[in-house]
Amino acid sequence: MKTIGYAIVGTGYFGAELGRIMKEQEGAKIVAVYDPENAETVAKELGCDVETDLDKLCSRDDVDAVLVASPNYLHKEPVLTAARHKKHVFCEKPIALCYADCDEMVRACKENGVIFMAGHVMNFFRAVRHTKQLIAQGKIG
């Protein structure tokens, strides 16, 4: 199985948690993070590099996909940068705060032939995973 290299933009609660979950997944490796406030702390926990420039982050050969978990109003730039560098994108919700930005982001990913996924999923939350385990064990549901 090929290992997919991920970079995380925004290492607050959601970005750090996505990193922790991805670190546990077979075939996935967090290779770098970008965040002006707490990248160092999260990078140390995840065992990855810190990048201080989006273009450098997205131009890395070991990055296949970019997870965008920055504050909502900061989603556009990393999505467009990742698409320009031909990196697949997972973007936390809401992907944009206005239709024009959303349209531009989706269009950029299409034009560059990369997958763009909005993070409308909950299976990364510990409570949801724990509930799934309890159901599988027959303890609930």
What are the functions of these language-model segments?
Residues 1-46:
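N-terminal Rossmann-like dinucleotide-binding module
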Residues 10, 93, 138:
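Conserved G/P- and acidic residue-centered "switch" motifs that form tight phosphate/ATP-binding loops
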